[in-house]
Design a protein with these regions (language model features):
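Short active-site neighborhood of thiol/selenol oxidoreductases, capturing the structured segment around
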Residues: 44-57, 83
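The canonical Cys-X-X-Cys-His
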Residues: 57-61, 119
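Sec-dependent signal peptide recognition
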Residues: 1-7
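Typically the conserved alpha-helix immediately C-terminal to a functionally engaged Cys/Sec
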Residues: 60-78
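Hydrophobic h-region of N-terminal signal peptides that target proteins for export
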Residues: 8-17
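Non-catalytic, surface beta->alpha helical segment in thiol-disulfide oxidoreductase systems
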Residues: 109-151
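Boundary of Sec targeting at the N-terminus
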Residues: 19-21
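A short beta-strand-turn-helix
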Residues: 29-48, 77
Length: 151
């Protein structure tokens, strides 16, 4: 009986975590090896857009459900950027653009991610060229994409 109860609680926790995920389904899947991701994106004429989020973040949820749900924004983002999501409390292993390996949460600290959502746009060498923190309304998001493309 204890095993069944423990399994039920574990499954309930996984379901709750999945519902709390503030990442759009159209974001790229990545092995989080950013030297390779930057190179591949550049080969396609794109740049990386890193999206730092956390479960239970109201601004992350609003960004996902409004701005990142607009078809024109999805299309424009995917045309010029490769969006990759990172959990500020995450344990996944990441290889940063300088070759160092760390956990998602350590990378967030390294990049001074202090609030969520945080969007970081990288140039074709992997350097951060633009940062946006907090909810970004659709009009401002479009302007942000244009600015990141110009830099």
């Amino acid at each position: 009986m204890r095993i069944v109860l423990a399994l039920a609680l574990a499954l309930a926790g996984l379901a709750a975590r999945a519902q709390g995920n503030e990442v759009p389904g159209w974001f790229a899947e990545s092995f989080l090896e950013f030297p390779q991701d930057v190179k591949e994106a550049a080969g396609e004429g794109k740049r990386l857009m890193l999206y730092f989020w956390q479960d239970g973040c109201p601004a992350c949820r609003k960004l996902k459900e409004t701005t990142l749900a607009e078809r024109a924004i999805v299309d424009q983002t995917r045309a010029y950027f490769v969006p990759v999501a990172l959990d500020v409390h995450g344990e996944r292993e990441v290889q940063w653009t300088d070759g160092r390996t760390m956990r998602e949460k350590e990378l967030a600290r390294e990049l001074n991610v202090r609030g969520t959502p945080t969007l970081l746009f990288l140039d074709d060498k992997g350097a951060v060229l633009l940062r946006r923190v907090g909810y970004v309304a659709p009009e401002r998001f479009v302007a942000t994409l244009a600015e990141a493309r110009r830099r």
